[in-house]
Curated annotation (Swiss-Prot):
Name recorded for this polypeptide: U1-hexatoxin-Hi1a
Any single Pfam family the record assigns to this protein: MIT_LIKE_ACTX
Swiss-Prot/TrEMBL keywords: Amidation, Disulfide bond, Pyrrolidone carboxylic acid, Secreted, Signal
Residue numbers of Pyrrolidone carboxylic acid PTMs: 19
Transferase listed as a keyword: no
Organism (species): Hadronyche infensa
GO CC field: extracellular region
Family: Belongs to the MIT-like AcTx family.
Tissue and organ expression note: Expressed by the venom gland.
Segment forming the signal sequence: 1-18
InterPro entries referenced in this protein's UniProt entry, alphabetically: Atracotoxin
């Protein structure tokens, strides 16, 4: 019985943290990107092409690319993910 309760808890937690994206559900480390179709895409890593994390469509999805992973920011001059430095305020 305890195993069943733990399994139910894990399923509920997974569905809470997942993002619905068209017919898919995006998990951790991904975002829902649109163009040419809606699909789950990995969040930006160092030097990946990115979009500002605030740039979302009305649907909450990102257009073209995902924002950068934690600890990084999207440099809008180069449109690439860069590491945050201690002197940078976001």
């Amino acid at each position: 019985m305890l195993k069943f309760a733990v399994l139910c808890f894990l399923v509920i937690m997974a569905s809470t943290f997942a993002q619905k994206c068209g017919d898919q559900v995006c998990g951790a480390g991904t975002c829902c990107a649109e163009y040419p179709e809606i699909h789950c895409k990995r969040v930006g890593q160092l030097y990946d092409i990115c979009v500002d994390s605030e740039a979302t469509k009305d649907s909450g999805n990102h257009l073209f690319f995902c924002p950068c992973d934690e600890g990084m920011y999207c440099d809008m001059n180069s449109w690439s993910c860069q590491k945050k430095t201690s002197g940078r305020s976001e």
